[in-house]
């Protein structure tokens, strides 16, 4: 029997919606990365993008454990000398919670050419509203929430 190798047309993409209310950021990111890569499917192939679309709502209500809210810092660089900027996750979640979730998910995707393609299937929204009701997303439950 020959080994099955999936073709690009074999990708059966579904839409999932995740409510980030009181979900720990790292746990949310790891489940999201698994869905984006397609590792939950029996047709997973590491060299192809077989993943699903993921919608994350209520990004502003995501939780961080311990003292990470004040001590963990998010960095970015302008490209100019002395252009390193940093801010705590408390400031980042207050100003741009979508960026905080995208940054966590991006860190859990592989560092190769497929990462940008997989990350483009991630849709993050600050509040509960999203424009993807026509795609009929299925609710994806994450078992543990922050206490």
Swiss-Prot record:
SUPFAM superfamilies: Ribosomal protein L13 (SSF52161). It comes from Micrococcus luteus (strain ATCC 4698 / DSM 20030 / JCM 1464 / CCM 169 / CCUG 5858 / IAM 1056 / NBRC 3333 / NCIMB 9278 / NCTC 2665 / VKM Ac-2230). InterPro entries: Ribosomal_uL13, Ribosomal_uL13_bac-type, Ribosomal_uL13_sf. GO terms for cellular component: cytosolic large ribosomal subunit. It holds the Pfam family Ribosomal_L13. GO terms for biological process: negative regulation of translation; translation. GO terms for molecular function: mRNA binding; structural constituent of ribosome. The keyword Nucleus does not apply. This protein is one of the early assembly proteins of the 50S ribosomal subunit, although it is not seen to bind rRNA by itself. It is important during the early stages of 50S assembly. This is Large ribosomal subunit protein uL13. Belongs to the universal ribosomal protein uL13 family.
């Amino acid at each position: 029997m020959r080994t099955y190798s999936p073709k690009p047309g074999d990708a059966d993409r579904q839409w999932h919606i995740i409510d980030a209310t009181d979900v720990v950021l790292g746990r949310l990111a790891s489940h999201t990365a698994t869905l984006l890569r397609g590792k939950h499917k029996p047709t997973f192939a590491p060299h192809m993008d077989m993943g699903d679309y993921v919608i994350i709502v209520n990004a502003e209500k995501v939780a961080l454990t311990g003292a990470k809210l004040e001590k963990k810092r998010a960095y970015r660089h302008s490209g100019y000398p002395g252009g390193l900027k940093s801010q705590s996750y408390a400031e980042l979640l207050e100003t741009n919670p979508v960026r905080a979730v995208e940054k966590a998910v991006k860190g859990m995707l592989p560092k190769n050419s497929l990462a940008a393609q997989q990350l483009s299937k991630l849709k993050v929204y600050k509040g509960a509203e999203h424009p993807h009701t026509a795609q009929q997303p299925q609710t994806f439950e994450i078992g543990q929430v922050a206490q």
